[in-house]
From Swiss-Prot:
Active site: E216
Protein name: Stromelysin-3
Residue windows of the Hemopexin repeats: 291-339, 340-382, 384-432, 433-480
Subcellular location per the Swiss-Prot or TrEMBL entry: Secreted, Extracellular space, Extracellular matrix
Reported cofactor(s): Ca(2+); Zn(2+)
SMART domains linked: HX (SM00120), ZnMc (SM00235)
Post-translational modification: The precursor is cleaved by a furin endopeptidase.
Name of the gene this protein is made from: MMP11
Amino acid sequence: MAPAAWLRSAAARALLPPMLLLLLQPPPLLARALPPDAHHLHAERRGPQPWHAALPSSPAPAPATQEAPRPASSLRPPRCGVPDPSDGLSARNRQKRFVLSGGRWEKTDLTYRILRFPWQLVQEQVRQTMAEALKVWSDVTPLTFTEVHEGRADIMIDFARYWHGDDLPFDGPGGILAHAFFPKTHREGDVHFDYDETWTIGDDQGTDLLQVAAHEFGHVLGLQHTTAAKALMSAFYTFRYPLSLSPDDCRGVQHLYGQPWPTVTSRTPALGPQAGIDTNEIAPLEPDAPPDACEASFDAVSTIRGELFFFKAGFVWRLRGGQLQPGYPALASRHWQGLPSPVDAAFEDAQGHIWFFQGAQYWVYDGEKPVLGPAPLTELGLVRFPVHAALVWGPEKNKIYFFRGRDYWRFHPSTRRVDSPVPRRATDWRGVPSEIDAAFQDADGYAYFLRGRLYWKFDPVKVKALEGFPRLVGPDFFGCAEPANTFL
């Protein structure tokens, strides 16, 4: 076996320490001397290269030549190693300038892990720099980034040399500085930096790690290279200080993930009674007993984290696999502190945020953590309220509808706006009555509409309510006895 091939073998990885392997990697001259199709054969065994999934019409990399290499910096200016979008893709995105890869993360809370570090910088400097590079993106979106130190993270960061296992070899100092992999590809979230660069922080006498890292994280989030002036997502490296996003960068990432949530405002709590001071406070009353699910007309219903939640008068019923969970019904404030009572409607969006509506206001939670609210419904483009029901529709949770009386609106969480303040007629939903109280979608794609103690099941294929409905909510969802009188 040739020495270069042995260095990339499993035996070498087992016998030699990782840092020694880095030092023994073949230099650019040996890499160029490999057979022209060697890395293409490897790519065929593993499938298409990761960026091909996002850019079907990207040109194939030029085959290696036998020409003795010159220093990379004399061949071309330093740049990102992610291939530029094809002409066709650029033309389709020319009006909006920023270019998308075709993928995005379907969540907003992401983790990252640093596997290896550059030799020029201490580890704590690198950690702070990576956090700062991610912060330029989280400042303009709802995204959050948390470092982890073991296991698989969403974003895996590494410093490597030459051939390093992804068919996109580095070329030594200068030239290609780093590359990253888009969402929805087989190596999504991987970010690789060339170990042989002279990495610095805030210094133009080398390669600024902060700027390069922020650029690569843009790829990880789904952005391609752009030709917009002074954009961070430009393919070519130019030292700029301080680091900032251009308007084009902001528009691109907000097109994918939306704008950041407004800061939650909290009222300063009044001081409690102090010792030795008489007060006229009345002790808080114990909450009323929960309503009977067999007789209740529910305020809202929503599928949250794959489970079904029924809301009524400040209480919540939690069903998993069709079974009411122990400890329920319980106060809804047990899960969502500060949630008003009662709620008019609720839904979970594709990013896992849970929206609640009451009157002319709405609230948003990330799990059980409040991130927004109360906020006016007019921010969403609604001029009529309250919202009586909210329905998440479609396999990707990308269609959300608000219902009120005989009207409905389509809502986009990414922009936080309805299509139009002018509603459509609810008669579009054939066989479903007007004035519904709640709505939700099950795992099979069927929609359910509740009014009073009855519900209608809606077929997504025939686009109409199924025969045999309405039926009673109590017996079908809570195992209640069927009433003797069938005339409801």
